[in-house]
Structures are given as structure tokens and as C-alpha cells.
Amino acid sequence: MEHFDVAIIGLGPAGSALARKLAGKMQVIALDKKHQCGTEGFSKPCGGLLAPDAQRSFIRDGLTLPVDVIANPQIFSVKTVDVAASLTRNYQRSYININRYAFDLWMKSLIPASVEVYHDNLCRKIWREDDKWHVIFRADGWEQHITARYLVGADGANSMVRRYLYPDHQIRKYVAIQQWFAEKHPVPFYSCIFDNAITDCYSWSISKDGYFIFGGAYPMKDGQTRFTTLKEKMSAFQFQFGKAVKSEKCTVLFPSRWQDFVCGKDNAFLIGEAAGFISASSLEGISYALDSAEILRSVLLKQPEKINAAYWHATCKLRLKLFGKIVKSRCLTAPALRKWIMRSGMAHIPQLKD
């Protein structure tokens, strides 16, 4: 059986970034359930907006986005809607509108050939034995068994690695539901929607390449019903839908306490959403995926004696930032406080009317 220095499970932004950064420095194997190219396979429900912090990560790495990853149009404000209060405000934001699936495949394409990458595979089992991590996965129609000194869980909200390391760990989860429609709005826009009767998280919309995408994060039990109810409510705010072209669904984490951030143990590490590194106030996770990958790269290459403790300490600033997002989320989802902020007009940019 083949042995590696590092086995990475999952090649979203976090896993792809780490694999790229370790290439040529350590012997790495990376496993991913997405296809290598094309439009088939798993596509994560995501508004597809690249936040300024994520943009800074690309500046740091000297990377530029290819044109086929960038979506049209580029929107410079977010229309914030409080459904219960019937309030709408416009706030300036500096996001880059991207095609999320194309972005994920592009990130994978940057991984050098020295990394052994398996696409469209199923990781079936992991365990630790004789100071090694064992991984069994199915690829190309047959099962393979490898070992690694270090195991990295970059496998998102339903992380197999996190469940193995922390079987009793509980974190709030929501179902993210998103539908695509033919664009009917005369002026494209991006929106953030709050309705506490529907969800204590939030919903969103984005215009992208001739489509209007509407989605949100809802309680697991009756998420589809709540999503449908909110769609009906949004007609009062001039949202236009029609027949859905495509529907997407996945689990999303919603950290609500300091203990929700878990970094790993026993030479296993968690990065990105698998570690709980996702903003509770916006559900933005790409920037934290890239940052945690960079932090772990540095730790792995330095090889400190207590390597898991070193990673835990190195992510302290990141975790504090994310804890601040939890506090911000509680403010944004508190109806009275949100209503007061929006009515105050702070940072609101009124749109001129003809």
C-alpha cells in the first residue's frame, strides 16, 4: 500500500489551495468527489460572490481570476430586505460575481502534477493505526487503500474527518436551498433577505449570466416549505421568478459558539467549513478556507513538535474574527435592532428615481 506525507479529503477552495501550496514540498494525495472538468457532478449551492478577504488571499498568492470564472454583471451594492418591517436599503459592497462551480474546478486545475489527485471518487473509510492514518476510497471502479502521516479534512459541512475526530460534537446545521430562474428583472441586483418567521439565518438572491438565483439557509426539518413560502412573500418586493431552471441543495454549518471551531488532533487537521470556519453573519466561507489553508501550510512545513497545538494557536486570530461574526449575526437577526439600524439610514445609498 502506498504511503504519503499528507492525505487531503475534499478539494473545495481550502483543499485545493493547500494541495497547491504543499506540492513539491511534501508527498501529497488529494481526493475529491467533484469531476475534473465539465458541468456534471456536485455543485455547491452558493451565491458565488468573492469577498474582499478572499480577494486579498489571491493577491497574496499572486493569482488572477480567468475570465471564464467571472460572471456577469458585476454588482456594487446589496439590496437588504427586512420582510416583516417592509424595509429595503442599499449598502455598498465590493464583491466579485463568479461562477462557483467553474471557480472550484479552476482552483483544482492549479494543483501541480506532483500531487496525486483522484477526482469523482468516494472516500469510504478512515482510521488511525500504528501512528498512521489509513484511508480507503473508491476511484476508477475499484477500492484503494493508502496511508498518510497527516490527514486533512477539507470536506465541508458534512465532513467525514470531523465526524471521526469528534463523534459527539454538535454544531448547528441548516439546509441551503437555491433555485435558478431566467432573469426577468430590468436591473440586475444582489439581495440579502431577513425574515425571522422563515429562518433565523438569512436568504439571498443574485443575478448571474442571464439567470436570477434565489436561495437561503433554513431549518433542516421543513426547509423546502419555508423556502417556498418566502418566494411567495417576495412578490411584494418586486422579485420575479417564473419556472425554475435548476434546483440545488446542501447542508451548511452555522457556528453559534466558540466551541464550534474545531481544528483537529492526532496528526489530523480540519480546514475551511469542515473546521466550522464560515461566517455566521453572511455564510461566506471562501476567504476563511483560503486563510486556514495558508495557516496549515505554514505549520506543516515548519514541523513543530506539537503540531496540532501549533495549528490551534496559529488559527486563534481567524477564530476570533469568526466569533465576531457570530456576534454580528445575532445583531442582524434580532428584529428590533435590525429594524432600528435600517430605519436610521446609516450607510444606506438611496437610488435616484427618474
From Swiss-Prot:
<dbReference type="InterPro" id="IPR050407">
    <property type="entry name" value="Geranylgeranyl_reductase"/>
</dbReference>
<dbReference type="InterPro" id="IPR036188">
    <property type="entry name" value="FAD/NAD-bd_sf"/>
</dbReference>
<comment type="similarity">
    <text>Belongs to the CbrA family.</text>
</comment>
<protein>
    <recommendedName>
        <fullName>Protein CbrA</fullName>
    </recommendedName>
</protein>
<dbReference type="InterPro" id="IPR002938">
    <property type="entry name" value="FAD-bd"/>
</dbReference>
<dbReference type="Pfam" id="PF01494">
    <property type="entry name" value="FAD_binding_3"/>
</dbReference>
<dbReference type="GO" id="GO:0071949">
    <property type="term" value="F:FAD binding"/>
</dbReference>
